[in-house]
Amino acid sequence: MGNKVTGSGFPVYKGKGATLQRALINYFLDKNTSSGYTEVQPPVLVNEESAFATGQLPDKEGQMYHINNDDLYLIPTAEVPITNFYRNSIINSSDLPIKLTGYTPCFRREAGSYGKDVRGLNRLHQFDKVEIVRIEKPENSYKVLDEMVAHVKNILEELELSLIHI
């Protein structure tokens, strides 16, 4: 169906697939919020400054979808708008940690197809992601990264999903 509407790389979920997709999104968001993350619903379009501030531009410009009339970019990941909420801000250490979670559809012009080069993954141009973002003191960054990986790993294990080299 996606091929008919937009071309390859744009999936359509229908019936039980759509229901499962929605349930998983809600499950991940609920797990994240019950672990102290605040849910946000960021925009899926960002300006050039936001894409540049997160390193998407100029490095990944060829992978991003650009809307010429408005000079906006479709987000490749929720981290782009979420981290830009705090761009050019001074955050008091007493306000840390900042723990956010968000669901967004994401858009990338990813090359590749199912096979060894992409470890058996189908590369999609549109896909859904639930993400966690933490803003912390720099000296805590490695410890926090380990905590975030453990949090996600725990959720996947609860679902009895095999882990792809985390």
Question: Can you say where each PLM-predicted feature lies in the sequence?
Answer:
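TRNA-recognition modules of translation machinery and tRNA-sensing kinases, especially anticodon-binding
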Residues: M1-I164
